[in-house]
């Protein structure tokens, strides 16, 4: 049975699928720091001999797929929202996408060289974070890499989506919290960074790359 919080998040992102596809389609072109962190992740996976299979967890409309594929990886996206997956399949027909929850991923144990969670872990309730990080570790090969971006803040619960007509829970996460969750799940943090908010953003952004032990 899906809990009310998860159902609200799914419905909200179903409603936002086309808007996100339009707004985010080429946003990486305007985000050099995000590209740099993703590029570092790609280099670590490929240089580590971990293969090319990577998961894009909370992929939304699939905006990262062209970049990851262009760097020589083979992404597979998953998202909680069926509408996000429908749009991702339409816009990126050469990439596999599936409906799935980060707390229960459709990947075999130790099957991926890397996983990307780009602004997707911030939707998890605090009680769900340990399970999600353990699940990410489960699907990674030994020495595989996790890369995540998140809205950096004080870990307090906020309500998001109101400016676009929906509502859902969201957390602005502290770097300390993200490092702790990764470490507790069996990761070794190899990189973390942050940047100030851009003019069209309301909060700083954080980045973390961690390697499965």
Question: What role is predicted for each listed range?
Answer:
Residues 1-49, 154, 196:
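Conserved class I S-adenosyl-L-methionine
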Residues 53-57, 61-104:
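Class I SAM-dependent methyltransferase SAM/SAH-binding core
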Residues 103-115:
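A short acidic, Gly/Pro-enriched loop at the edge of an enzyme's catalytic core
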Residues 130-142:
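A short glycine-rich, Lys/Arg-flanked "PGG" loop and its adjoining helix->strand segment in the class I
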Residues 143-150:
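Conserved beta-strand signature within the Rossmann-like core of class I S-adenosyl-L-methionine
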Residues 151-169:
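Short, glycine-/aromatic-enriched active-site segment of Class I SAM-dependent methyltransferases
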Residues 170-185:
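Short alpha-helix
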Residues 197-213:
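Core SAM-dependent methyltransferase catalytic element
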């Amino acid at each position: 049975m899906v809990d009310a919080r998860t159902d609200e998040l799914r419905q909200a992102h179903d409603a936002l699928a086309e808007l996100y596809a339009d707004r985010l389609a080429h946003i990486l072109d305007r985000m050099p720091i995000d590209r740099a962190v993703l590029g570092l992740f790609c280099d670590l996976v490929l240089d580590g001999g971990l293969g090319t299979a990577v998961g894009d967890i909370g992929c939304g409309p699939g905006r990262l797929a062209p970049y990851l594929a262009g760097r020589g990886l083979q992404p597979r996206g998953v998202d909680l929202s069926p509408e996000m997956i429908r749009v991702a399949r339409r816009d990126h027909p050469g990439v596999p996408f599936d409906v799935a929850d980060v707390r229960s991923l459709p990947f075999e144990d130790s099957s991926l060289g890397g996983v990307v969670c780009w602004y997707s872990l911030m939707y998890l309730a605090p009680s769900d974070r340990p399970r999600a990080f353990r699940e990410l570790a489960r699907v990674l090969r030994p020495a595989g890499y996790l890369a995540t971006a998140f809205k950096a803040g004080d870990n307090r619960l906020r309500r998001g989506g109101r400016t676009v007509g929906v509502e859902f829970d969201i957390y602005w996460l502290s770097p300390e919290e993200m490092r702790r969750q990764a470490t507790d799940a069996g990761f070794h943090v190899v990189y973390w960074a942050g940047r100030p908010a851009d003019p069209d953003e309301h909060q700083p952004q954080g980045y973390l790359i961690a390697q499965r032990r």
